[in-house]
Amino acid sequence: MEKTLSIIKPDAVKKGVIGKILDRFESNGLRIAAMKKVQLSKEQAENFYAVHKERPFFKDLVEFMISGPVVVSVLEGEGAVLKNRDLMGATNPKEAKAGTIRADFAESIDANAVHGSDSLENAKIEIEFFFKPNEIC
């Protein structure tokens, strides 16, 4: 069964919409195989988003991701990566389709409520970043 990583970002955690977002996953056929709430350190955020290190938004992204706790989940299901990305909506909430997580809960392109793996390969890497094998069930 395909797995993907989801992060509910600090803006959505602060708004108290964790349950609403998790319900979107479950009601659309994604099973929560692992989940934890964590406060990322600066080093963890920099390592997780290292692929963006040379991008102009990197510093702001890291600062945002350490501004409060996040909820990290492993989602499992048929076509989990694509299904999660469809549920999230466009990166910029202004461009996200009505009914998507970002259209409903995100504030801006920076505070955009959720992160989701963009490929099966990255999902594997991202899941291993946050979870040990025995934490996924």
From Swiss-Prot:
It comes from the Bacteria. It catalyses: a 2'-deoxyribonucleoside 5'-diphosphate + ATP = a 2'-deoxyribonucleoside 5'-triphosphate + ADP; a ribonucleoside 5'-diphosphate + ATP = a ribonucleoside 5'-triphosphate + ADP. Its EC number is 2.7.4.6. The active site is at H115 (pros-phosphohistidine intermediate). InterPro entries: NDK-like_dom, NDK-like_dom_sf, Nucleoside_diP_kinase, Nucleoside_diP_kinase_AS. GO terms for cellular component: cytoplasm. ATP binds at K9, F57, R85, T91, R102, N112. Keywords: ATP-binding, Cytoplasm, Kinase, Magnesium, Metal-binding, Nucleotide metabolism, Nucleotide-binding, Phosphoprotein, Transferase. It is an enzyme of class 2 (transferase). GO terms for biological process: CTP biosynthetic process; GTP biosynthetic process; UTP biosynthetic process. Its cofactor is Mg(2+). It is found in: Cytoplasm. One of its GO terms (molecular function) is nucleoside diphosphate kinase activity. Gene3D superfamilies: Nucleoside diphosphate kinase-like domain. Belongs to the NDK family. Homotetramer. Major role in the synthesis of nucleoside triphosphates other than ATP. The ATP gamma phosphate is transferred to the NDP beta phosphate via a ping-pong mechanism, using a phosphorylated active-site intermediate. This is Nucleoside diphosphate kinase. It comes from Campylobacter jejuni subsp. jejuni serotype O:23/36 (strain 81-176). The gene is ndk.
